[in-house]
């Protein structure tokens, strides 16, 4: 009796393990849900997904939604997109939204957009409801030197045919900013821009800025416009300051050259004085030699001494008169 009980429990345990393994590899509830929704899927197909490491619910549930929406999508297409790393549920939702909005979008196109890293569902929604992109303040300078700042609102619609390989929102903002700057810069007076800001949007819109992008520009509206700095006056002030600094540098250079020349002349004067002193020191020797050789007499020597004394006296009187005049 005990052996029979043990055998019974062993059989029950093996049966439970077998059922657990069976339900792990065979998603019966998912298969029943698909049958209830009218989607015919072989149970062996679901088992094959398990073996290929595909989560069956990630493929079957979107297939049920696509079938209910009337889309002719096969399970092989969805599984292939899943194995490629795509978001199956998002692609199916985008196809359903495009089908409801009468937008032509095939599964291959939607899968390619999804694998390219674009949000295909958002693209379909933007095709139905255009998106508004607001730019920051963009500054341009008119010909009169006044800075004008403008903020624009760009209404764009997604172009599904150009989503793969097309430029994004940053390119749209950059191109519109470039158009605003060039339009403001072409005006002779900033007042014309303030009086007619619509001129900016019309000029920019006519340049075909959406070429090569994933969007179609519907409208460009100037949301705000403001006056900035007087760039012309600032540039003139900077130029005047630079000219002043250059003039000061040149004046300082000339002053330094004058000081150097003055010092050089003083050095030359001292050099000449030294030569004079040196020459004066040789005069007594020359006179002694002249007296010794008989070239001059004693009376001649006395006359020279008298002339020297008279000269010294006149120099002294001249210096005294000069000092009195200065006082």
Swiss-Prot record:
Regions crossing the membrane: 6-26, 28-48
Q: Induction: what does the entry report? A: Expressed during sporulation stages IV/V, part of an operon with downstream gene BMD_4542.
Role according to the record: Found in functional membrane microdomains (FMM) that may be equivalent to eukaryotic membrane rafts. FMMs are highly dynamic and increase in number as cells age. Flotillins are thought to be important factors in membrane fluidity.
The record's subcellular location field reads:
Cell membrane; Membrane raft
GO CC terms of this entry:
membrane raft; plasma membrane
Spell out the Pfam families in the cross-references: FloA (PF12127)
For this UniProt record, the keywords arranged alphabetically read as follows: Cell membrane, Membrane, Transmembrane, Transmembrane helix
Entry protein name: Flotillin-like protein FloA
Q: How does it assemble?
A: Homooligomerizes.
The UniProt entry lists membrane topology as:
Multi-pass membrane protein
Checking InterPro entries in the record gives: Band_7, FloA
Family named by the database record: Belongs to the flotillin-like FloA family.
Q: Which domain of life is it from?
A: Bacteria
């Amino acid at each position: 009796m005990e052996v029979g009980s043990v055998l019974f429990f062993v059989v029950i345990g093996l049966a439970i393990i077998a059922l657990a393994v069976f339900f792990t590899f065979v998603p019966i509830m998912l298969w029943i849900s698909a049958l209830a929704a009218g989607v015919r899927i072989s149970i062996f197909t679901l088992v094959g997904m398990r073996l290929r490491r595909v989560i069956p619910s990630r493929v079957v549930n979107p297939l049920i939604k696509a079938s209910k929406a009337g889309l002719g999508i096969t399970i092989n297409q969805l599984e292939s997109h899943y194995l490629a790393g795509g978001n199956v549920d998002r692609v199916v939702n985008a196809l359903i939204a495009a089908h409801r909005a009468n937008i032509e979008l095939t599964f291959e196109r939607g899968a390619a957009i999804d694998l390219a890293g674009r949000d295909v569902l958002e693209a379909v929604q933007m095709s139905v409801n255009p998106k508004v992109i607001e730019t920051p303040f963009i500054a341009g300078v008119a010909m009169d030197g006044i800075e004008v700042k403008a903020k624009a609102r760009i209404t764009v619609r997604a172009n599904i045919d150009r989503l793969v390989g097309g430029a994004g929102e940053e390119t749209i903002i950059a191109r519109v900013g470039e158009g605003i700057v060039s339009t403001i810069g072409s005006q002779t007076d900033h007042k014309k821009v303030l009086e007619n800001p619509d001129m900016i949007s019309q000029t920019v819109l006519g340049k075909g800025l959406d070429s090569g992008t994933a969007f179609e520009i519907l409208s460009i509206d100037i949301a705000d416009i403001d006056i900035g700095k007087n760039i012309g006056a600032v540039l003139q002030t900077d130029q005047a300051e630079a000219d002043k600094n250059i003039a000061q540098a040149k004046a300082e250079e000339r002053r330094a050259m004058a000081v150097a020349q003055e010092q050089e002349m003083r050095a030359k004067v001292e050099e000449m004085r030294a030569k004079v002193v040196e020459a004066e020191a040789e005069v007594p020797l020359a006179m002694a030699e002249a007296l010794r050789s008989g070239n001059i007499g004693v009376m001649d020597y006395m006359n020279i001494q008298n002339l020297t004394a008279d000269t010294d006296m006149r120099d002294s009187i001249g210096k005294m008169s000069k000092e009195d005049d200065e006082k």
